[in-house]
Design a protein with these regions (language model features):
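Acetyl-CoA-dependent GNAT
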Residues: 8-12, 19-93, 105-106, 145
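Conserved acetyl-CoA-binding loop of GNAT-fold acetyltransferases
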Residues: 133-143
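Conserved acetyl-CoA-binding loop-helix of GNAT-fold acetyltransferases
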Residues: 91, 97-110, 134
């Protein structure tokens, strides 16, 4: 049994968050991506990159007690106030399938960046597509294949 809490990212969290992301990439994504692709992604999630990303987004961490076990952020899509983008949503493999990812997405969808936007997008790994589909995200423009960055674009639109 674990005790799940979520809170906003704090300075100093970037080291544990980087570890969560790199561990998850290395273990959970190995069935869908090449070792070279995973290694490139791990290099792009250093503590410095995470700290910068957290300054640009509303970034949250999921904790079991005091241990960071997951993370995720939401930001304006290319600076837009009408569109948002979910970023860096990861859950340690040992906690996957236990509601942590769902709670992270629900927290992001309760954030002001989600509420002000008519459209929210996420670039999903192949590994996580079914998770986002369960959370109500649809394939952007009906495209189910990965893009040039190796992700599948999904979106959620508010009824207009």
């Amino acid at each position: 049994m674990y005790t799940l809490t979520l809170r906003r990212f704090r300075k100093g969290d970037e080291f544990a968050v980087s570890d969560v992301i790199c561990t998850t990439l290395a273990i959970s994504n190995q069935a869908d991506y090449s070792p070279e692709f995973i290694e490139e992604n791990i290099r792009s999630h250093s503590p410095e990159v995470i700290a910068a990303r957290a300054e640009e987004a509303h970034f949250y961490v999921a904790l079991d007690g005091e241990t960071i076990i997951g993370c995720g952020g939401i930001t304006g899509y290319w600076g837009s106030k009408e569109e948002s983008y979910l970023t860096s949503i990861f859950v340690l493999p040992d906690y996957q399938g236990k509601g942590v990812g769902r709670k992270i997405v629900e927290t992001l969808e309760a954030d002001e960046y989600f509420h002000r936007a008519w459209h929210t997008e996420v670039g999903s790994s192949l590994t996580a597509v079914s998770f986002y589909r369960k959370m109500g995200y649809a394939f952007k423009n009906g495209i189910t294949d990965t893009d040039e960055y190796g992700v599948v674009r999904l979106e959620k639109r508010k009824e207009q």
